[in-house]
Amino acid sequence: MNFSARSTLIRLLNGDLLVHSPSPIDDELIQQIAAIGRVEHIVAPGNYHYFYVSDWQRAYPDATTWICPGVERKRTDLHFDWLLGNRSPASWEGEIDQVLLRGTRFIWEVAFFHRASRTLVLTDLIENIGDATQGADDVLLKLWWKAVFRMWNRPKPAPEYQLGWSDKAAARECLERILAWNFERVVIAHGDCIEQDAHARLREAWASPLTS
């Protein structure tokens, strides 16, 4: 099944680059990044988005590694510098806001809001896979997302979220904090980014924890 993931590069005001949800890296990508700046922050924003952190650490040994709580339990061998939380660290305070999502059973994630571009950056809180998605002709992908998960052309949280919320009140508080941000677009790890009606589409996708 062709299920790809997107990495996001954010340039901070001082010129440092932050890589969010590291993807596979090779010499060609390293050269492309070098034309933009230097990676100083490696961010594993969720407990399913850490697989290539070690590769990026080898490519950028002086970078600081930040991980979502829970990753350290899944990868006890992974070196990291700091755990992410609800407060932005000094490295990007005033530029990027963040929320550690609580109230979930199987999946953990930190949401980020880049103020200057008014962009919300998520991993699994929204997946937007459908007819326009690259790789949409994959038969297994379409079977699972359309027939099983009923998420085809319908942005929703990842199936791991839908399996159950441990504390919907806590989750609702976190989601409302995210919706209070003044974002215009949503960059996500899986599927097509949301460029229009972002607030309304997210509120609809999160209807279950928001209204329960």
What annotation goes with each model-predicted range?
Residues 1-28, 110-114, 118-123:
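Conserved beta-strand hairpin/beta-sheet module of binuclear metal-dependent hydrolase folds
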Residues 19-21, 40-47, 66-68, 121-123, ...:
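Active-site neighborhood of phospho(di)ester-bond hydrolases with catalytic His/Asp-centered motifs
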